[in-house]
Amino acid sequence: MKPRKIILMGLRRSGKSSIQKVVFYKMPPNETLFLESTSKLTQDHISSFIDFSVWDFPGQVDVFDAAFDFESIFTQVGALIFVIDAQDDYLDALARLHVTVARVVTINPNICIEVFIHKVDGLSDEFKIDTQRDIQQRTQDELADIGLENVPISFHLTSIFDHSIFEAFSRVIQKLIPQLPTLENLLNIFCSNSLVEKAYLFDVLSKIYVATDSSPVDVQSYEICSDFIDVILDIGSIYGRSSQLKPGHSPEILDETSSVIRLSNDLVLFLREMNQYLALICIVRADNFEKSGLIEYNVQCLQTAIQSIFSPRT
């Protein structure tokens, strides 16, 4: 699969660099307070199960300036993520967003435009909803005035201090995976035949879920599965083989890694590696997990199918 280009944009201090460091470099959120504001265009290649080229544009830089080759930059972009600080006056940010969207869609009409309404951790639930509604309505009205009412834009409430940023990035990444419908169908079949309540395919580096079955995503189940990955990687770093992790490169799950945790609510978490970067995490009722042999057989079938999907065609 060829690398996907993702562009992060937004005004200064909107939180773009913090998002990138937390999601792809496992930086603790509290440490992002000491990050300096981005002063120049940075490009990071994130090497994992799915390769990404993430471009972080400084907030003070005008990408439409003659110094930038605007067309060549945006022609091959899979997704544009525009970050808005929800705790600040966002009218200037919206003005920049509207201009950016109007220019970008003329160059790349298939680009995925995602708006992260960021830093919502300090806001009440009611204020979050009101802020999202206001930003969404202003954007739709402004674009409609210039004849772009049909441009699809997705809005996400995000914070680096909880799992919402990973959930939002998961939604973005899934739009860039052409095999997503096939993966979802495989997971649906697996869950049905294995009596599994919920199944996720996680990218280990970023804790982004590449795909899940068609049942509704419950925030609590996603959070506990995401935390499960941290536990496995932490234990692996202590008792597994020693390796120095390069920035932007995924920690590898050891071959044939599997783990089971029984929860107090009569549920079982089951993890199984699909390859060195991708892990399957399932939520199973304890009674159904007694048929672990059946589940293991179906996992092997699923693993074979996934590997065949992404294997190079000759």
From Swiss-Prot:
Source domain of life:
Eukaryota
Sorted keywords for this record are: Cytoplasm, GTP-binding, Hydrolase, Membrane, Nucleotide-binding, Nucleus, Vacuole
GO MF term set: GTP binding; GTPase activity; protein serine/threonine kinase activator activity
Localization terms from the record: Vacuole membrane; Cytoplasm; Nucleus
Which CDD domains does this chain map to?
RagC_like
Binding positions (GTP): S17, S18, S37, H118, D121
Annotated catalysed reactions: GTP + H2O = GDP + phosphate + H(+)
Q: Which GO terms describe its biological process?
A: cellular response to starvation; negative regulation of autophagy; negative regulation of cell cycle switching, mitotic to meiotic cell cycle; positive regulation of TORC1 signaling
Instruction: Give its E.C. classification number.
Output: 3.6.5.-
Membrane topology, record value: Peripheral membrane protein
A UniProt-annotated Pfam family: Gtr1_RagA
Major site of localization recorded for this protein: membrane
Membrane-traversing stretches: none
Q: Which GO terms describe its cellular component?
A: cytosol; fungal-type vacuole membrane; Gtr1-Gtr2 GTPase complex; nucleus
Q: Which InterPro entries match?
A: Gtr1_RagA, P-loop_NTPase, RagC/D
Summarizing the function annotation, the protein's role is: GTPase involved in activation of the TORC1 signaling pathway, which promotes growth and represses autophagy in nutrient-rich conditions. Also required for TORC1 inactivation during nitrogen starvation.
Family the entry assigns = Belongs to the GTR/RAG GTP-binding protein family.
Q: What is this protein called?
A: GTP-binding protein gtr2
